[in-house]
Amino acid sequence: MDVVFALGGSVLMPKEGASTENIQNYAKAFKKLKEMGHRVSVVVGGGNTARQYISVAREFANESFCDEIGILATRMNSMLLISALGKDAVKQVPENFKDAEIILNMDKILVMGGTHPAHTTDAVSATLAEFIDADLLVIATNVDGVYNKDPRCNENAVKLDKINTKELLEITGSSSMSAGSSGVVDPLASKIIDRAKLKTIVVKGIPEEILASVTGNHNGTTITP
């Protein structure tokens, strides 16, 4: 199966900083999926690294410039994961989908970050999935699925086990799109998922759930066309 993962930068690089064990555990999960015969692509977010830099830069620069900072942060995080993957990855971060496809055709795990200003890595992963005609898009984030309301500020929010892409659009329609913003799925990614009719799964961004999203026994949200 051809699978694209959107790996949240905040789960790879939590607030407490880089952890060798944490990054190694993600690398092991992606390696295992490759060993099982799946073609694996990972788009890594900027997470806390991006937000820290952007919060300072925003005092001096516009949103477009802050977007560029965020893109660089995603590529630094990507390099960390690439280093842990060793021979299973190519030691460079592609900046466009054609170069990404070349890496996939080398039978390597593809790892990349952001590509364009105003595009989150969720949107990049959805576009990549459409570009390579992937079988599945998995969004691994710091929330364990899609909720009817933001669970981080609504204690009555209800997790949705299964929704369709139109329902996803309704839920994500009012999300923020400023540089460094974070949400379960951003509006642009939702539109691409709907347009491309991508089967998508949103899971808690831990190695166990990443594996489970492909084997079929995950605890997240399944989004169908």
Curated annotation (Swiss-Prot):
It holds the Pfam family AA_kinase. This is Uridylate kinase. The keyword DNA repair does not apply. Belongs to the UMP kinase family. InterPro entries: AceGlu_kinase-like_sf, Asp/Glu/Uridylate_kinase, Uridylate_kinase, Uridylate_kinase_arch/spir. UMP binds at residues 46, 67, 115-121. ATP binds at residues 9-10, 47, 51, 141-142, 147, 150. It is an enzyme of class 2 (transferase). Keywords: ATP-binding, Cytoplasm, Kinase, Nucleotide-binding, Pyrimidine biosynthesis, Transferase. Catalyzes the reversible phosphorylation of UMP to UDP. Homohexamer. GO terms for biological process: 'de novo' CTP biosynthetic process; UDP biosynthetic process. Inhibited by UTP. Its main location: cytoplasm. It catalyses: UMP + ATP = UDP + ADP. Gene3D superfamilies: Acetylglutamate kinase-like. Its EC number is 2.7.4.22. The keyword Signal does not apply. One of its GO terms (cellular component) is cytoplasm. GO terms for molecular function: ATP binding; UMP kinase activity. Transmembrane segments: none annotated. It is found in: Cytoplasm. Pathway: Pyrimidine metabolism; CTP biosynthesis via de novo pathway; UDP from UMP (UMPK route): step 1/1.
